[in-house]
Amino acid sequence: MNIKNSLILIISTIFVLSMINGGLTSDPTCVGAPDGQVYLFSSWDFQGERYVYNISQGYLSLPDGFRNNIQSFVSGADVCFVKWYPSEQYQITAGESHRNYAALTNFGQRMDAIIPGNCSNIVCSPK
């Protein structure tokens, strides 16, 4: 076997193994969030349970499994991530993604809600 064939075999093996292990699906471009949607994940690296938020939903108090548990996300829209008490807000833009959002800012472990548009649109917390 010559060097060229050996390299082709090695590269093909790496490619196949990465597909089997899900390595290629961890890329946010593969996960893909369509325009107007945000994918929220309960595990880092775009894994675990996935919640699909659509901006047509307006204000959303996160469901129990995701409240204080956003580990990674992919955004196809401008949205505001919110923590009500004490008040914190993070502006997220379309095309933004984080593999380990909880570790990066620790905010994923405190997040309560998501609001479409800019954080400046927030007037007060819901009662």
UniProtKB/Swiss-Prot annotation:
Q: Name one GO cellular component term.
A: extracellular region
Q: Where in the cell is it found?
A: Secreted
Signal peptide boundaries: 1-25
Question: What protein is this chain from?
Answer: Spore germination protein 1
Q: Which family does it belong to?
A: Belongs to the Dictyostelium gerABC family.
Residues with an annotated glycan are: 54, 118
Q: Give GO BP annotations, semicolon-separated.
A: spore germination; sporulation resulting in formation of a cellular spore
Q: Which UniProt keywords apply?
A: Glycoprotein, Secreted, Signal, Sporulation
What is the source species? Dictyostelium discoideum
Keyword Signal tagged:
yes
Q: Which domain of life is it from?
A: Eukaryota
Q: Does the keyword Signal apply?
A: yes
